Each structure stands twice: as structure tokens, then as C-alpha cells.
Amino acid sequence: MIEAGHNMKDRILFEEIPHGTEYLQTVIDAMLQSKELEVDYQSYYGHRATYHMHPYAMKVYNQRWYVVGYIREKEGIRNIALDRTLELTIGTETFVLPDDFDAEEYYANTVGIFVNENQKPQKVVVRAFGKQVEYMRSLPLHHTQEEIKTVHEEYIDFRYKLCLTPELSTHLLAMGEKVKVLEPEELRSEIKNRLLATIQNYE
């Protein structure tokens, strides 16, 4: 299929990933060789640091490349965004990929890229209205999505089992008035407070 579409590149469009792609081959080489990466990194908040990372896996999310792996300085598994990387080189230290690490399982309980290993997944219930129902049926918010209540031509309640993360809140906020969080109260309050803060920006 790829070869068949080679001459149609002006008609088959993919989302552009603006930054970070220049490091992809280096990361892949480090993963293949089981070599540590030395990363000169600047966070979105401006903090700059050098990290030594065992690259376990890679993931694209929201037009950004991320590398997940063990960071020595953090003493745990973390993500780094390649578009925040200032310099990246392969070191001499080798590592062994843990037998119990599975990239899909690592992200299984979250929406997006953020993982808090101390957080347990919990029940989340979201009510969708109107056309948003079919949209969420065709593109579930999370793989645990279940329909638990249907009121014909009015709304459907979807249930999930996942961790509460900033990205989950962002996804729900992006749906605007087409959804309503029913449970848990913690998430419901957060969404409400962020909507009120948004309204204040327009006053």
C-alpha cells in the first residue's frame, strides 16, 4: 500500500511533527544496541538538566515524539519529549530491558503520555450528548470504554477505568458542552473549575 501511494504524496496527508524528528535515528540506535542516552533537556517550564536514560520505547502523541525509559537522575521510569531535547548522544553504558516492562501495559491506564505509577485506575463516568455519542462510539476516549446508560436521542453514559491525568482533563474540556463528567467528584470539580477560569479570561 505504501509503494502504491508513493506517487500520491501530495494527496495522502499526514499530521506534521514539527520538532524532534532529527533525534529519532539516534534513539532507535540506542534501543537496538541497549545503550544509555545522554540527554541535554529543557522542560516546558524552562528548567534545563542533563539526564542519563535507558530508552525502553517510543511513542507519538499530539504531534510530538516521546521516549519512555529509566532515568538515573530520577531513579524511575519517565517520559522525555524529543522537541524539548537540546542535544542527544549515545553513551558507553549498556542496560538490560526489564522483563516485566511492556510499553502497551505501561500506558494502559492513562489517556495521553503522563503516567503516575503511584496512582491507581478508578471509575470515570462521562455523559455524552447529541452527535458526540456517535463520535465517541467510533473513536473511544479509552480502550476501557463501556456504555452503561442510554436515553434515546438525549444522551449516553460511558464508563471507563483509568487514572486521572492532566491529559484526560484536557480531552474532556476540548469536547466542551457536548459532554458532562458524572464521576468521580474530584474530576468533576476540576473540569468545572477550569471552565470557570476560562470564562474569566473572557470577562
Feature roles, as predicted:
Residues 1-42:
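Bulky hydrophobic/aromatic content
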Residues 28-71, 78:
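Loop-centered beta-sheet repeat module
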Residues 49-51, 76-80, 124, 156:
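Short beta-strand segments
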Residues 58, 88, 148-149:
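A structural signal for short hydrophobic beta-strand segments in well-ordered beta-sheet cores
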Residues 61-65, 72-74, 91-95, 130-134:
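Short, charged/polar surface micro-motifs in flexible loops or helix N-caps
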Residues 74-106:
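Flexible linker/loop signature enriched in Pro/Ser/Thr and Pro/Gly
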Residues 108-203:
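Polybasic (Lys/Arg-rich)
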